[in-house]
């Protein structure tokens, strides 16, 4: 337990919290083990924000080894009800160009073996994932991209692969033919676990490259190339996040995210 409190939680890459003020580092223990790192608390406008580098501050934890439950529970310990989950993605569609933003409204889980629920019994709990992202936060995020004057796609399906390897060309072509928008390694189970805890969650994806199967002469992607594009657009993403955080209302009046378990349990 901790006596620290925050309004909004952000998962992201190391150094992402540098735009916050009055930063304090906090260690939180959870029933599910250690989070990826300590959390960094700071101010953005009037909001207290908690930041957690999902891969650890030295990017030492691969996506399939992240303790997603501990990360989300640490946010819950701070009293957080809103989660912003930005990430780098590969584009699966030509109209989504490197540097574009996508406010995802759906995901497809192609991971395997990840622990993806808090509810292993004794009460059967079946949380709906029909609309996995908070409609109110999505609306506010889209508005923030518009005010920041960045190119944004207002909907998109993000396919989440196991990692740490990138896709084969055949896999990538299949994802494109399915009509999915982007590809990533961390959105699942991160987004779903937030939902199980009745948190509002929004994904803001930044396209860093075209995935390998989209165009015939695209060279295989490398992690270094992804990070170069991500760093180039980091200021834009920070600006979007700042605008979003400053307009999130205190009360959750326009969504039902806080009532998810009411319709999920058999007693």
Language-model features: locations:
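Metabolite-binding pocket within alpha/beta catalytic cores that recognizes anionic/polar moieties
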Residues: 1-130
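Generic hydrophobic/aromatic pocket-lining and core-packing "Φ" positions
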Residues: 72, 172, 188-191
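Non-catalytic positions within long, well-ordered alpha-helices that form the structural scaffold/packing
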Residues: 76-79, 176, 195
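Short acidic/polar active-site loop segments enriched in Thr and Asp
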Residues: 81-82, 181, 200
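Active-site rim beta-loop-alpha module in soluble metabolic enzymes
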Residues: 132-177
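Zn-dependent metallopeptidase/amidohydrolase metal-coordination segment
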Residues: 185-223
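His/Asp/Glu-rich mid-to-C-terminal helical/loop segments that flank catalytic regions of hydrolases
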Residues: 212-264
């Amino acid at each position: 337990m901790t006596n620290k409190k925050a309004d909004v939680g952000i998962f992201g890459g190391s150094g992402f919290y540098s735009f916050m003020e009055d930063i304090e580092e906090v260690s939180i223990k959870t029933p599910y083990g250690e989070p990826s790192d300590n959390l960094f608390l700071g101010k953005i406008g009037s909001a207290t924000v908690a930041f957690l580098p999902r891969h650890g501050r030295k990017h030492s934890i691969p996506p399939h080894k992240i303790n997603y439950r501990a990360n989300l529970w640490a946010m819950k310990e701070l009293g957080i009800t809103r989660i912003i989950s930005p990430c780098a993605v590969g584009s699966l569609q030509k109209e989504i160009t490197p540097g574009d933003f996508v406010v995802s409204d759906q995901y497809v889980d192609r991971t395997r073996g990840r622990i993806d629920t808090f509810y292993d019994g004794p009460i059967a709990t079946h949380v709906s994932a029909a609309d996995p992202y908070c409609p109110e936060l999505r609306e506010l995020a889209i508005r923030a991209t518009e005010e920041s004057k960045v190119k944004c796609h207002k909907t998109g399906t993000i396919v989440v692969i196991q990692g740490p390897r990138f896709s084969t060309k055949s896999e990538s072509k299949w994802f494109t033919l399915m009509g999915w928008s982007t590809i990533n390694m961390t959105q699942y189970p991160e987004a779903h676990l937030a939902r199980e805890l009745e948190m509002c969650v929004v994904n803001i994806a930044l396209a860093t490259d075209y995935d390998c199967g989209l165009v015939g002469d695209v060279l295989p992607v490398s992690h270094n190339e992804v990070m170069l594009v991500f760093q180039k657009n980091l200021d834009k993403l920070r600006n979007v996040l700042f605008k979003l955080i400053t307009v999130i209302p205190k009360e959750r009046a326009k969504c039902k995210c806080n009532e998810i378990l009411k319709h999920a349990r058999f007693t």
